[in-house]
Amino acid sequence: MIKVKLVRSLICCNPTQRATVAALGLRKVGSEKTFKDDAAIRGMINKVKHLIEVSE
């Protein structure tokens, strides 16, 4: 399982990055979600890795 936490604001981001964060289910700074470790989630994490914090 992967725990993802949003640590930076989406103000400076382009619409694609905002959509990726929304698809991960993260709304406010500090919100967390847990996911199964699969290729789709890893790809989404790699697109917005500068905005989130990942722990396994």
Swiss-Prot record:
GO terms for biological process: translation. GO terms for molecular function: structural constituent of ribosome. Gene3D superfamilies: Ribosomal protein L30, ferredoxin-like fold domain (3.30.1390.20). SUPFAM superfamilies: Ribosomal protein L30p/L7e. GO terms for cellular component: large ribosomal subunit. Pfam families: Ribosomal_L30 (PF00327). Keywords: Ribonucleoprotein, Ribosomal protein. The keyword Ribonucleoprotein applies. It comes from the Bacteria. Part of the 50S ribosomal subunit. Belongs to the universal ribosomal protein uL30 family. This is Large ribosomal subunit protein uL30. The gene is rpmD.
